[in-house]
UniProtKB/Swiss-Prot annotation:
InterPro entries: Mitochondrial_Carrier, Mitochondrial_sb/sol_carrier, Mt_carrier_dom_sf. Solcar repeats lie at residues 13-104, 113-202, 212-298. This is Congested-like trachea protein. One of its GO terms (molecular function) is O-acyl-L-carnitine transmembrane transporter activity. It is found in: Mitochondrion inner membrane. It comes from Drosophila melanogaster (Fruit fly).
Length: 306
């Protein structure tokens, strides 16, 4: 099966179409990858063990086993309502931002961008998604960790969590971690789209028909997702710790988190949770681009000139 149109098309980018197809792809991403995201967050935010004590989780599979034992399989899906509710607009804004970033740099209708320009367009997309991403991530992290750390259940779902955050600290509390989210997404989004487009170019050059197969699109999306996390993981660890910490823990924001983590845990702590996120990255992002592929095919049938 071949794709008649995908994200890497050389035709003048269409932000509106990218908004719609990206939203559907984002839903596919969350549904396929949330359990491993929960494990990642719990590993990143687990309390430091006292001298002589064992850590709360010994690794990815231990975290999964304890979560299922203590909370059932549903425990792996804690906090999914926040990203699932916000993921359509988040991915929609991300892919629309990418299309707009490309469009602003394209000099002609069929002009092909250079790889540095693709990186810039991808980074530009991070500006669009952060406004929605940051509060959604803040709520998701709190819901994912409130049981994992053995404390009393403070939040009864997404709406309750958002309401309590606003009551306690206003919009500043709801948007806590926005700078850390942007620090992660601007460079990581740039690499994400750069890797995707480069792999699509390779697939197209090897295709006898000049068309790109669905399998190639899925593979490129999966690898791009892994590249995103290789670059974005350190900022994501800092973001998760900042967003899950009680108010006043880190007085200088992400700088305080970075200093505390490096001094007490060492630089390798910046990649804590890398195993579940890498296990998640390929299938989740492959599912995302497969969803985009299906959405594009739908539009090609019902609105071929869109």
């Amino acid at each position: 099966m071949t794709t008649t149109e995908n994200v890497s098309t050389e035709r003048k980018a269409n932000p509106v179409k990218s908004f719609l197809t990206g939203g559907f792809g984002g839903i596919c991403n969350v549904l396929s990858g949330h359990p491993l995201d929960t494990i990642k967050v719990r590993l990143q935010t687990m309390p430091r063990p006292a001298p002589g004590e064992q850590p709360l989780y010994r690794g990815t599979f231990d975290c999964a086993a304890k979560t299922i034992k203590n909370e059932g399989v549903r425990g792996l899906y804690k906090g999914m309502s926040a990203p699932l509710t916000g993921v359509a607009p988040i991915f929609a804004m991300c892919f629309a931002g990418y299309a707009l970033g490309k469009r602003l740099q394209q000099r002609g209708e069929d002009a092909k961008l250079t790889y540095p320009q693709i990186f810039v367009a991808g980074s530009f997309s991070g500006l669009f998604s952060t406004l929605i991403m940051a509060p959604g991530e803040r709520i998701k992290v709190l819901l994912q960790t409130q049981q994992g750390q053995g404390g009393e259940r403070k939040y009864n779902g997404m709406i309750d969590c958002a309401g309590k955050l606003y009551k306690e600290g206003g919009l500043r509390s709801v948007f806590k971690g926005s700078c850390a989210t942007m620090l992660r997404d601007l460079p990581a989004n740039g690499l994400y789209f750069l890797v995707y487009e480069a792999l699509q170019d390779v697939a197209k050059s090897k295709s006898e028909t000049g068309q790109i197969s669905t399998a190639s699109t899925i593979f490129a999306g999966g690898v791009a997702g892994m590249a995103y996390w290789i670059l974005g993981m350190p900022a994501d660890v800092l973001k998760s710790r900042l967003q899950s910490a009680p108010e006043g823990t880190y007085k200088h924001g992400i700088r305080s988190v970075f200093k505390d983590l490096i001094v007490k845990d060492g630089p390798l702590a910046l990649y804590r949770g890398v195993t579940p996120i890498m296990l998640r990255a390929f299938p989740a992002n492959a599912a995302c681009f497969f969803g985009i592929e299906l959405a594009n095919k739908f539009f090609n049938i019902v609105a071929p000139n869109f």
